[in-house]
Amino acid sequence: NLYQFGNMIQCANHGRRPTRHYMDYGCYCGKGGSGTPVDELDRCCQTHDDCYGEAEKLPACNYMMSGPYYNTYSYECNEGELTCKDNNDECKAFICNCDRTAAICFARAPYNDANWNIDTKTRCQ
């Protein structure tokens, strides 16, 4: 779920950047997404959005409150290393891996302050 995703981001980047800095970045980090990603970090968000889209198509994720935004999965954070636990069902495992992959991607990608809170109407066509 989104709360766990935020915690994964903090784990992967060792708390160096607040999660809220990723909520309104580029064309894809935050609610919605369109156009061409502005940089590597924005591509991480586009990939994460696409992964959630795939999760929503899974039969195992096709029931009320089972989607990627609400479903609670089991994972572990150990000194920046993220592990999705084996006790997750198919849907939870898929969502956990979407979030894990994105959190690692965020931690590796450079953050450009100029791409925070951009005018998406003009920059994300």
From Swiss-Prot:
Active site: H48, D99
Expressed in which tissues: Expressed by the venom gland.
GO annotation, biological process: arachidonate secretion; fatty acid biosynthetic process; lipid catabolic process; phospholipid metabolic process; positive regulation of fibroblast proliferation
UniProt keyword annotations, A-Z: Calcium, Disulfide bond, Hydrolase, Lipid degradation, Lipid metabolism, Metal-binding, Myotoxin, Neurotoxin, Secreted, Toxin
Protein's name according to its UniProt entry: Acidic phospholipase A2 HTe
InterPro entries linked to this entry: PLipase_A2, PLipase_A2_Asp_AS, PLipase_A2_dom, PLipase_A2_dom_sf, PLipase_A2_His_AS
Cofactors demanded by this protein: Ca(2+)
Cofactor binding: number and manner: Binds 1 Ca(2+) ion.
Localization terms from the record: Secreted
Post-translational modifications reported in the UniProt record: No glycosylation was detected on this protein.
Recorded family membership: Belongs to the phospholipase A2 family. Group I subfamily. D49 sub-subfamily.
Ligand binding (Ca(2+)): Y28, G30, G32, D49
EC number: 3.1.1.4
Stated role: Snake venom phospholipase A2 (PLA2) that blocks neuromuscular transmission, but that does not produce blockade by virtue of a selective action on nerve endings. Instead, the toxin acts both on nerve and on muscle. PLA2 catalyzes the calcium-dependent hydrolysis of the 2-acyl groups in 3-sn-phosphoglycerides.
Record PROSITE patterns: PA2_ASP, PA2_HIS
Molecular function GO terms recorded: calcium ion binding; calcium-dependent phospholipase A2 activity; phospholipid binding; signaling receptor binding; toxin activity
Annotated catalysed reactions: a 1,2-diacyl-sn-glycero-3-phosphocholine + H2O = a 1-acyl-sn-glycero-3-phosphocholine + a fatty acid + H(+)
Organism annotation: Notechis scutatus scutatus
EC category name: hydrolase
Location, primary (coarse class): secreted
